[in-house]
């Protein structure tokens, strides 16, 4: 398998995270720019298991093993949500989101309001964070600072 395909990351996660291998934690979506950054949305089939915590591991040991394999690529593990507003907000991490407005549910268009200090973080270097969040969620995301609506 090519190291550049999203399935490569999922394969690494299955090797390092027993909860993914045994189906307790499920990878719901993945968006990747190989060598730069990957975003993975996870959910748990067991309310007792935190899906993000299971992926990161105690002291970050599980995520560290994956990061070692992908050599410098960043990996964001976030909670998947059936609610598109929550999922979009989660996908824009590490930025803080104030509000997500669905502008057109049918065409999957949303506006995200962030504090002005979070705008560059939400968009990311070269638009990378916004691009990966849009790919991950399947929504067109328009990010605005809270004062410019």
Language-model regions: role of each:
Residues 1-149:
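RNA-contacting regions in translation and RNA-metabolism proteins
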């Amino acid at each position: 398998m090519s190291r550049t395909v999203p399935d490569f990351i999922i394969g690494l996660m299955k090797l390092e995270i027993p909860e993914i291998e045994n189906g307790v934690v499920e990878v719901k979506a993945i968006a990747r720019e190989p060598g730069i950054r990957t975003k993975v949305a996870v959910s748990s089939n067991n309310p007792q298991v935190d899906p993000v915590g299971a992926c990161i591991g105690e002291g970050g040991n599980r995520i560290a093993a994956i990061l070692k394999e992908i050599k410098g690529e960043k990996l964001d593990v976030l909670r998947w949500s059936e609610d598109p507003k929550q999922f979009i907000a989660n996908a824009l991490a590490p930025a803080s989101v104030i509000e997500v407005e669905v502008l057109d549910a049918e065409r999957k268009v949303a506006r995200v309001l962030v504090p002005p200090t979070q705008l560059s973080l939400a968009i990311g270097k070269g638009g990378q964070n916004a691009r990966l969040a849009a790919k991950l969620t399947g929504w067109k995301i328009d990010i605005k600072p809270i004062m410019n609506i």
